[in-house]
Amino acid sequence: MYRTTCDAIAAILRQHTGKEDVMLTDGGDHADVASTIAFSLAKELRKAPAIIAQEIAGAISDQVMAETGAETRAVGPYVNFIFGAEYCMNVLEQAVREGYGKGQEKSERVVLEHTSANPNGPLHVGHIRNTIIGDTLARCFRKAGYPLEVQYYVNDMGRQIAIVAWGIATQGADIHAEGKGDHLIADVYIEANRHLEKEPALNAEIDRLMQLVESGDPDTISQFKIPVKRCLDGFKDTLAAMHVKHDRFIYESDFIRNGDTAKVLSRISHLPEARIEETLSLDLSAFGFEKNYILRRSDGTSVYAARDIAFHIWKGHNFDRVIDVLGADHKLIGTQLQATLEILGERVPEIVFFEFVSLPEGSMSTRKGKFISADELIAETERRAMEEVTARRSELSEEERKKIAHSVAISAIRYDIIRTIPEKSTVFDWKEALDFEKQSGPYIQYAHARACSILEKAESYTPCFEAEGEGEIALTKQIALFPKVITEVVTELKPHLLAIYARELADIFNSFYHAEPVLRAEGKIRDRRLTLVDATRNTLKEALETLGIDALRAM
């Protein structure tokens, strides 16, 4: 409704001014939307922007009111538009429907890759920021109506996997013992690294394994596949606990076996930017890179980047929009990949780079064995959530409290990580993340549960899609913004915008709840406010689910 109304106002402004860009922007505290077109017309018309704004407002106000129900006001150099009663009525009628915020089905095919951690140990706190950013974006794309495939790119032939395979062969480790496979693989990897650090000459064995797997040796391929699968099974369990699922796992080795890597290296070798010495590399100085981009080693084996290029060419041929989520430590290789694909004339991926989330406990290095796994984070957050839930709802059975505590824990983790803009590093704070009274996932869940409780206590009412008074109108207009925010997230690739929106909706609802009697109101006022509570409940539910968070009916 917000977008439809803005589009109608923009069309009227274009008709009146003759300008394609009518400079609509957020209206702030004074309006729902505003136009700054008077500034751009000032030089052409040789008038002050404030005078132009007055003239535009006077000329279009009747048409705007007739077509949209919005009031037009000139305030200084701005043309402000305040949406009216009809707008609020339409918003509420839509907002109580299941699936509110769902966009029209699109034809543009989107592929989104996220997480893609090396299968040499459990996911850690740093990995799950990638996971949560990627999964939230995926949910927003689906909400916006895009056909989407979510992929996990499995590095099943890199040096880390060679070290694991060597470690299993030389240490006799039982990776099929009881326990999560990713943690068992980490034990092997850490111990193998200790041996390699003590005896560096053993690295020749690792190099030999990498050559064998690239040449297609079946025994070595099998030697690599077994620990990779064991580790991925552990990853999938962790991801499922966080409400995350990938549509497809793509294996790096596929692009060696199907010949795509060899083909792309051949293409690259004929480029003017190619540098063939002992290695094959690309001169990317035209893109600001000082060092050449090495793609093939002196021993003839391809590096990870070469397989990654082949993978992205395949994605570009099968999808219309290609999106990757990568940590800031991958910024160099990510931008080198983009430059190379541009030179090749292939589809260039959009990359969401993120800074890392950390805990006060410090290091998360898998190689040294100093890391805090995602499993440990979830378990500790669940323990703390259980304490909070027990303090609030001691009358519930232990099973009920555990169920709520798990949902609250995942909400706390997901929201605390997604609420910060990806480009900014953050420290996960248990106290803030689990605070039911402040800016947290559980706080938004609690607002939803409160709305559910009000409606259950009300029992029956007659839906009334009207909003009167400052509190009701403010809440209705916040509800109206939900579809707009989803569009902004998928356009700008900024999932934190949805987190901010959901928190603000919870804030406005809580203010409304404390200021306006709902259950104690009578007649039409009661019906009106209960309808608004239901619209809020449904919008909070849709927002929470799009954030990957359970919309609990009771907490």
Curated annotation (Swiss-Prot):
Pfam families for this protein: Arg_tRNA_synt_N (PF03485), DALR_1 (PF05746), tRNA-synt_1d (PF00750)
Keyword match Magnesium: no
Motif ('HIGH' region): 117-127
PROSITE patterns the UniProt entry points to: AA_TRNA_LIGASE_I (PS00178)
InterPro entries in the record: aa-tRNA-synth_I_CS, Arg-tRNA-ligase, Arg-tRNA-synth_N, Arg-tRNA-synth_N_sf, ArgRS_core, DALR_anticod-bd, Rossmann-like_a/b/a_fold, tRNAsynth_Ia_anticodon-bd
GO MF entries: arginine-tRNA ligase activity; ATP binding
Cellular component GO terms held in the UniProt record: cytoplasm
Keyword tags: Aminoacyl-tRNA synthetase, ATP-binding, Cytoplasm, Ligase, Nucleotide-binding, Protein biosynthesis
Sequence similarity: Belongs to the class-I aminoacyl-tRNA synthetase family.
Protein's name according to its UniProt entry: Arginine--tRNA ligase
Organism of origin: Methanospirillum hungatei JF-1 (strain ATCC 27890 / DSM 864 / NBRC 100397 / JF-1)
Phylogenetic lineage: Archaea, Methanobacteriati, Methanobacteriota, Stenosarchaea group, Methanomicrobia
Gene: argS
